Amino acid sequence: MKEKVQSALDNYVLAYMNNDKSLFRSLWDDEAVFEDPVGAEPCKGIEAICAFWDFGHAEGMEIKPTNVETIICANEGILKAVMEVRNSNDNSGMNIAIVDHFIINDAGKIVTGRAFWNEDTISQPTDIKSMDIFIDDFKDRG
C-alpha cells in the first residue's frame, strides 16, 4: 500500500509541476472529497474537484510545488510543500506553505484530501508583484 500512496502523492506533485489537469483528475476517486483550505466548503466528487483545479489555474496562472516532503503511514500520506503561485498576466504571485493530508483507497485513488494553510503560511517573493488573497474570499469561491 505504501507504494500506492507514494505514487499518488508523487503524481499529484507532477500534475502541478506540468500543469496537467488530466493527470490530476486521474488521481481521484469519482466520489472523493477535497477540502482546500480546511474550513472551506469541500469539493465533493470528481467534477467539483476538477472545477477547483480550474479555479486555481485560470488564464495565466501556474502553481508549482517546491521543497516537497512526504510522509506515508498505511493508506495515508502527508505532502508538505511550498506552492509557488504565479500570474503571468501581471507578474504577480505568492508562495503558500501547505501541508496536505490524503487518504488513498485500495485502487490507489485519493478518496480524501485536506489542505492545511492560512494567511500566516503565505509569503511574498521579492522579485514579483504582490498577489492579494483573502482566505474568506478563497473559501467562498462558489
At which residue positions do the language-model features occur?
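A beta-strand edge to alpha-helix "cap/lid" segment located at domain peripheries
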Residues: 1-4, 50-142
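Short, low-complexity N-terminal intrinsically disordered segments enriched in polar/charged residues
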Residues: 1-26, 30, 131-142
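Alpha-helix C-capping/helix-to-loop hinge sites
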Residues: 12-15, 35, 86
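A short gly/proline-enriched turn/hairpin at secondary-structure junctions
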Residues: 33-43, 55-59
